[in-house]
Amino acid sequence: MYGKLEIGKSGFKLYGEKFYLASGDIHYFRIHPSSWENVLDLAVDFGLTAIQTYVPWHLHEKKQGHFDFWGQDGELNLKGFLELCDKKGLKVLLRPSPYICSECDMGGLPAWLIKRGREIYRCCDADYINAVENYYKRLCAEFLPFLSTNGGPIIGVALENEYGGYGNEEGYLLKLRELLSENGVDVPFYTTDTFDSLMLVNGSVDGCLCGFNFRSTPSETEKALELLGKLKPEQPLFVGDFWCGRSQMWGEKYSPRDPRETAEAYKTALNMGAYVNFYMFAGGTNFGFTSGSLYGAPFTPDKEKNYPRFLPYTTSYDGDALIGEDGNPTEKYFLCRDILDEYLGKAKRPHFIDRKKSQELTVKLTEAASLFDNLENIGGEVRTTVLPLSMEELGQEFGYVLYETRLNGSESWTRLRLVNSVRDRASIYLNGEYKGTYTRDGGNEPIEFTVPKSGIKLGLLVENLGRCCNAAVLGEIKGLVSPEITVNLKNSFNWKQTSIPLNNLNAIEYKSNFRKEKLLNYPVFLKGEFEAEAGIDTFISTEGFTHGNIWVNGFNIGRYWNAGPQKTLLVSGGLLKDKGNIIEIFDTEYGGKTEIKFLSKNLLY
């Protein structure tokens, strides 16, 4: 059927008939395609009529002008996801960036936008708008056939994301609408902002449906919807993001939201006549290096640690959602489903759905390889400069950079200080020997050592843990970013930089006769082969490993870290074969383990 969503004070109409909008966020790029159908079936069972999803610019155009709508294994196949939504009878609310936040690296903006001294985003800056225009031309061609006006499932398209909390340039939002319209988008546009009258004024434009975002507590729900009703009496009460949980951060305690409170808040919203979108309805995974970070105070019950600092997000994007990262419905799912059923006059249903099957395995790690022995095989660009270059200046988005310099032997003892220099984590080596690790905002002490008369080579393996996604610090650079790299209060010059994006491990030269004692505390790749039941999920336990990433059959599952709270990494069953599966682990400070366990459940906090 062909038609356009009609928006009136009393609600919505589609194809000339009343349409009840019940929606939730499910992000195609955070779920392996083999699991899309499971979560969409659960959405239908719940009673949703639409799915909302962001479109991540930073993943679809990692390199300027090079577009990717497939990813590692189909997780960026936007067309495939839209087709499946349509098949399931679900409409779609599409949020096509540019900025999406969503705890993504740089809020979904691609790193190639960064230019030192010119961090201008989310406005009508000519360079920025030109980049958006080129992206939209390609992106719109991808989803235009799926607009409801073309017989597809997309009934609404968002302009930006919570812009009212960042800027006040109405012309910018109008420009985005103009660009989308010029590329054929003719369904209604909408905006969402944190509930505040000024944010709504700054973040909305005439002719667009306006929504509020807020936490799922009864009191906040009532306040937000009362304010929205006063500010926008001509439209339905629309909740763009009903925050029913929150994201995890490495090294922080995690407090799930009370599912009964969320259900009560949902009931409050429905009884006030609101149309609610759950954020998140289904959790997911920040595959590879794609998670972002926050610079600010954490959401933690530990008051002693509640001060502003750098906080990288975990690989898991479970988000305390109604459907967990593992694809199973939670208590929150059933309680909120009860509320919707009651509101719509449906019969009460039992709280039971078959859980997804999972499997346990133990895998021997029979091969190993030193990162330093394989730099020529997997390293990227190598450059030597007086001052260190940032990751972005090396043309790199994610991963690691090895910085090396020579220290003269004129001092009997030496003190190394990295003042505001490391973004975000650095393993430190002297003549190849591990000496310690610096972390950004980690309260690190200076490292002291002796330099022989012949001098010594200093090496810093620096990792990007995710660019900040909060608006105030967009566009931060990564790597060694400051000249304040001092040895005995003297600046260090003449640096060799080796780019290590870890986007292809095929050329690594593994050895089966390795001695683990010689590899302890060094950056090491480990490899093992295993059998499994194809199509069945499992969860890799990272106990005994320090920090790094894991690949299964070439797919970068994501980052692990013994800082916690996340203790497992999800492996979608769609990645597994019955035989010949390969696991590869990169550990920045190898601890000596030669086997790894796969569990039947997710351990997130």
Question: In which residue ranges do the predicted regions lie?
Answer:
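N-terminal carbohydrate-binding accessory modules
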Residues: 1-50, 83
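Aromatic-lined substrate-binding rim segments of carbohydrate-active enzymes
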Residues: 36-105, 177-182
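An active-site-proximal structural segment forming one wall of the substrate-binding cleft
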Residues: 74-94, 117-154
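A cross-kingdom feature marking solvent-exposed beta-strand/loop segments within repeated
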Residues: 310, 329-332, 393, 411-415, ...
